[in-house]
């Protein structure tokens, strides 16, 4: 695998650190007036999802992580595992519920997700960036109730809760950004 200097660290790069794969979320190169330059790096441990902040000297380097991002279709959940299938080879990958984590609330049947594999084992699941879900529960918007931000919580068909505008009603289908869990628009 390729070796990356700390100067080459960019968001999205996956590296091996302390024997495990990490994804770099942000990297700030600092060149003090006195002393050696360094990179202040925020990264996420792919096996557990925990975030770590680390300082690397400008002479430090890290090996690229041998991870593969593959597009897999979500099939079903049997309680302990979420099952995904490769669309071309039809190979199935069971993924533990703790690995799926918060992504579970955005999973729809046959949704194409990005699953990160390390040594053939799924370690991360990213749902599609946008999903269309039906609202199953929300308060009715009262006429003239527009003071403040004008939002109300709504429960979606998968159990996720997002803040929506007052005019959105139960039974409507909305588009949601899964990265920020925010309402985008109504679907006609």
From Swiss-Prot:
Pfam families: EFP (PF01132), EFP_N (PF08207), Elong-fact-P_C (PF09285)
Residue numbers bearing the N6-(3,6-diaminohexanoyl)-5-hydroxylysine modification: 34
Subcellular location: Cytoplasm
GO-annotated biological processes: peptide biosynthetic process
Membrane in keyword set: no
Record GO cellular component, one term: cytoplasm
Primary location group: cytoplasm
One MF annotation (Gene Ontology) recorded for this entry: translation elongation factor activity
Assigned keywords, A-Z: Cytoplasm, Elongation factor, Hydroxylation, Protein biosynthesis
CDD domains: S1_EF-P_repeat_1, S1_EF-P_repeat_2
Superkingdom of origin: Bacteria
Cited InterPro entries: Elong-fact-P_C, NA-bd_OB-fold, Rib_uL2_dom2, Transl_elong_fac_P/YeiP, Transl_elong_KOW-like, Transl_elong_P/YeiP_cen, Transl_elong_P/YeiP_CS, Transl_elongation_fac_P
Processing and modification events after translation: May be beta-lysylated on the epsilon-amino group of Lys-34 by the combined action of EpmA and EpmB, and then hydroxylated on the C5 position of the same residue by EpmC (if this protein is present). Lysylation is critical for the stimulatory effect of EF-P on peptide-bond formation. The lysylation moiety may extend toward the peptidyltransferase center and stabilize the terminal 3-CCA end of the tRNA. Hydroxylation of the C5 position on Lys-34 may allow additional potential stabilizing hydrogen-bond interactions with the P-tRNA.
Pathway it works in: Protein biosynthesis; polypeptide chain elongation
Presence of the UniProt keyword Metal-binding in the record: no
Family indicated by similarity: Belongs to the elongation factor P family.
Function text: Involved in peptide bond synthesis. Alleviates ribosome stalling that occurs when 3 or more consecutive Pro residues or the sequence PPG is present in a protein, possibly by augmenting the peptidyl transferase activity of the ribosome. Modification of Lys-34 is required for alleviation.
Name under which the protein is recorded: Elongation factor P
Higher taxonomy: Bacteria, Pseudomonadati, Pseudomonadota, Gammaproteobacteria, Enterobacterales
């Amino acid at each position: 695998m390729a070796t990356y200097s700390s100067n080459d660290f960019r968001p999205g790069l996956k590296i091996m650190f302390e024997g495990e794969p990490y994804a770099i979320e942000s990297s700030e190169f600092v060149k003090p007036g006195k002393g050696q330059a360094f990179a202040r790096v925020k990264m996420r441990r792919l096996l557990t999802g925990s975030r770590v902040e680390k300082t690397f000297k400008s002479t430090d380097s890290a090996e690229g992580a041998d991870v593969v991002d593959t597009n897999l279709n979500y099939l079903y959940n049997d309680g302990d595992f979420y099952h995904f299938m490769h669309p071309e080879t039809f190979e199935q990958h069971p993924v533990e519920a703790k690995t799926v984590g918060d992504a579970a609330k955005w999973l729809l049947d046959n949704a194409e997700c990005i699953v990160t594999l390390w040594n053939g084992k799924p370690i991360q699941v990213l749902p599609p960036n946008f999903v269309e879900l039906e609202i199953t529960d929300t308060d009715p918007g009262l006429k003239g109730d527009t003071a403040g931000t004008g939002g109300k919580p709504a429960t979606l068909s998968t159990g996720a809760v997002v803040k929506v505008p007052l005019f959105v009603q139960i039974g409507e289908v909305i588009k949601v950004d899964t990265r920020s869990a925010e309402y985008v628009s109504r679907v006609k």
